Amino acid sequence: METATLVAISISRSLVSFTGYALYTAFGQPSEQLRDPFEEHED
Protein backbone atom coordinates (compact mmCIF):
# COMPACT_ATOMS: atom_id res chain seq x y z
CA MET A 1 0.00 0.00 0.00
CA GLU A 2 1.08 3.53 -0.55
CA THR A 3 2.03 5.82 2.29
CA ALA A 4 -0.81 8.24 1.59
CA THR A 5 -3.35 5.42 1.85
CA LEU A 6 -1.99 4.29 5.20
CA VAL A 7 -2.01 7.83 6.54
CA ALA A 8 -5.59 8.38 5.37
CA ILE A 9 -6.72 5.11 6.95
CA SER A 10 -5.02 5.91 10.26
CA ILE A 11 -6.50 9.43 10.40
CA SER A 12 -9.95 8.07 9.57
CA ARG A 13 -9.64 5.39 12.23
CA SER A 14 -8.58 8.01 14.79
CA LEU A 15 -11.55 10.24 13.99
CA VAL A 16 -14.01 7.34 14.20
CA SER A 17 -12.50 6.22 17.51
CA PHE A 18 -12.68 9.72 18.96
CA THR A 19 -16.30 10.10 17.82
CA GLY A 20 -17.23 6.77 19.36
CA TYR A 21 -15.55 7.68 22.64
CA ALA A 22 -17.30 11.07 22.70
CA LEU A 23 -20.69 9.43 22.13
CA TYR A 24 -19.97 6.86 24.84
CA THR A 25 -19.00 9.61 27.29
CA ALA A 26 -22.07 11.70 26.44
CA PHE A 27 -24.71 8.97 26.43
CA GLY A 28 -23.12 5.88 27.99
CA GLN A 29 -22.39 4.89 31.56
CA PRO A 30 -19.98 7.82 32.32
CA SER A 31 -22.76 10.31 31.54
CA GLU A 32 -24.21 9.70 35.01
CA GLN A 33 -21.25 11.60 36.49
CA LEU A 34 -21.75 14.67 34.30
CA ARG A 35 -23.44 17.67 35.88
CA ASP A 36 -26.14 19.76 34.23
CA PRO A 37 -25.50 23.49 34.82
CA PHE A 38 -29.01 24.38 33.62
CA GLU A 39 -30.60 22.28 36.37
CA GLU A 40 -28.34 23.85 39.01
CA HIS A 41 -29.33 27.44 38.16
CA GLU A 42 -33.09 27.54 37.92
CA ASP A 43 -34.43 31.07 37.57
From Swiss-Prot:
Record-level GO BP terms: photosynthesis
Lyase keyword on record: no
Residues annotated as transmembrane: 7-24
Keyword Ligase: no
Key words, A-Z: Chloroplast, Membrane, Plastid, Thylakoid, Transmembrane, Transmembrane helix
Subcellular location(s) of the protein: Plastid, Chloroplast thylakoid membrane
Alphabetical list of Pfam families matching this protein: PsbN
Domain of life: Eukaryota
GO cellular component: a single term: chloroplast thylakoid membrane
Membrane protein topology class: Single-pass membrane protein
InterPro entries for the chain: PSII_PsbN
Protein purpose: May play a role in photosystem I and II biogenesis.
PANTHER family noted in UniProt: PROTEIN PSBN (PTHR35326:SF3)
Family stated for the protein in its record: Belongs to the PsbN family.
Name of the molecule in the record: Protein PsbN
